[in-house]
Structure formats: structure tokens, C-alpha cells
Amino acid sequence: MGLDHRLVSSKRGTVIEWRKANQIHGWFDHQLGGVKNITRYPVKIKQLEFLLDDCIRVKEDLIAGGMKNFEQVTESGIKDGEHYEKKEMVPMFVNVTLAKELLPPTPGFFFGGYEFDEWYLKQIDETIEKLMEILSTKQKGERFYYDAWW
């Protein structure tokens, strides 16, 4: 359950699969004028190049700004009739202005976290790696499509 999404090639089948990478889904949602559940959308090569560029810019900016530990509620509930919260120090990126502009976390039902943390960067890293491979090995007449289900 949650956000699953992918990029599909007309020649190679599924070339990227994401799980709860809501910032990437939000990017496609914005670029494609809205994305409906279980609907396939054509994606232009130029759009994939723009996504790659945005991912690289955000990654470089996050790394340049560094990380800092922030207190975050990791668990809450009722115990012995009293409300409680468990808090932990969690490393998060400090300079997130560009990330908020280009690849902001996108809310949705079970879409994953909204923090600018190591998981956020890992999803961007994986997207960069896959897009570089896809774009460098593009085949003649190959078309790409994006779909998501949640």
C-alpha cells in the first residue's frame, strides 16, 4: 500500500521503479498537468532531461548546505491513559530552498515521508543514476511513459 510509480520504455519495459519517492511523483504531476491513479502518460525525452537536471541541482545544493540534527517525533500515542511522544534526533539537510522549489515533497495517502533527509537524497541519487543510463542508451523510436498507483 502506498505510492508506487515507474517510468516505462516502449522498447525495454519498466526502466525505473520508485516506491514512495513523492518528490519525483510531484515533479511528474506538475510537468504532466496532473497525474491520475493507474493512468499512463507519455513523457518526452526533454522532460526526462529536465528531471535529471533538477535532480542534479537539488543534490548538489543539499550536499553543499550540509546536515544538522533536528528533534523529531518518531512515535506518539496513548499509554496508561496518558498521551506520550517519543522523540529522536534525526539528521536533516539544512539548506532546502532549492529542493522545495524544484522537487518538493508531495503529500498523499501513504505517499511516504516529507522530510529532507538521507532517504530523500537516496531517491534523488537513484533517479540520477537511472536517468543517466536511460538517456545515454536511448534507442531509435523509443518512447517513454509514466504511471503511478496508490
What do these predicted ranges mean?
Residues M1-W150:
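Acidic (Asp/Glu-rich) sequence patches and key acidic residues
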